[in-house]
Amino acid sequence: MKVRNSLRSLKSRHRDCQVVRRKGRIYVINKTNPRFKARQG
């Protein structure tokens, strides 16, 4: 999982990427291709 300042560019890397808030943190998850996972902050 990558840790990034901005998730906007990561969201556009793959069409299945979703931005999700969990426990106050913002994550990018991808069910079909898990290597695109990322977290902000």
From Swiss-Prot:
Protein name: Large ribosomal subunit protein bL36
Source species: Paracoccus denitrificans (strain Pd 1222)
Family indicated by similarity: Belongs to the bacterial ribosomal protein bL36 family.
Gene that encodes it: rpmJ
Keyword terms of this UniProt record: Ribonucleoprotein, Ribosomal protein
Biological process terms in GO annotation: translation
A molecular function GO annotation: structural constituent of ribosome
Pfam families: Ribosomal_L36
PANTHER family: 50S RIBOSOMAL PROTEIN L36 2 (PTHR47781), LARGE RIBOSOMAL SUBUNIT PROTEIN BL36B (PTHR47781:SF1)
Keyword Ribonucleoprotein: yes
GO cellular component labels: ribonucleoprotein complex; ribosome
